[in-house]
């Protein structure tokens, strides 16, 4: 899966550590483009040892890959919202600098991959800290902001978001897939959520553009 194949918001159910490492290497090793990975995690899941075996950090050709990886621990939606604002600032400043032709602008196109794992943990922690209503507001605002940022791409900078969820949290998706009953109509995407939907199913129905398997 390459950057160009990603939708604005993509769900990736239970990727293996090997597939995740291959994805990172494939996208961050390209020439003539700066691809940065922002790995936002609530569960300390970045497969560092596997990645170092696949991409030895001591080799000169791999230095650039490691320089373009940012790993952040994020425990609630307030922290995720703050990170989203920082990414928006990065994209905006790069766009402004490119228009002005300043030395601060990235000379090669900037592509940002925002990889979020543990969103259900962040959501649950936010519910404990504030309220269910506030948590839903933060989730909605963050996801909508990511969509706006993705749509506002240009030749100098763009962003794509990947959300990792356990497969077992997407039982409704797999049931509908097996029965060939899912509809993509706008009306069905906007229908009221059934009681018992997991966070992953909620995001799949209302915010995600695709699900990668």
From Swiss-Prot:
Oxidoreductase found in the keyword field? no
Q: What would be the name of the gene that encodes this protein?
A: CSM2
A single GO BP: maintenance of rDNA
**Which family does the UniProt entry place this protein in?**
Belongs to the CSM2 family.
The protein's matches in Pfam families, at most eight in alphabetical order, are given as:
CSM2 (PF16834)
Q: How does it assemble?
A: Component of the SHU complex composed of at least CSM2, PSY3, SHU1 and SHU2.
Instruction: Quote the subcellular location field of this record.
Output: Cytoplasm; Nucleus
Q: What does this protein do?
A: Involved in chromosome segregation during meiosis. Promotes efficient recombinational repair and functions in the protection of the genome from spontaneous and induced DNA damage like mutations and gross chromosomal rearrangements (GCRs).
What Gene3D superfamilies does UniProt report for this protein, alphabetically? Answer: P-loop containing nucleotide triphosphate hydrolases
The species this protein belongs to is Saccharomyces cerevisiae (strain ATCC 204508 / S288c)
Keywords, alphabetical:
Cytoplasm, DNA damage, DNA repair, Meiosis, Nucleus
* Highest taxon of the lineage: Eukaryota
Q: What else is known?
A: Present with 414 molecules/cell in log phase SD medium.
Protein name (Swiss-Prot/TrEMBL): Chromosome segregation in meiosis protein 2
Q: Listed GO cellular component terms?
A: cytoplasm; nucleus; Shu complex; site of double-strand break
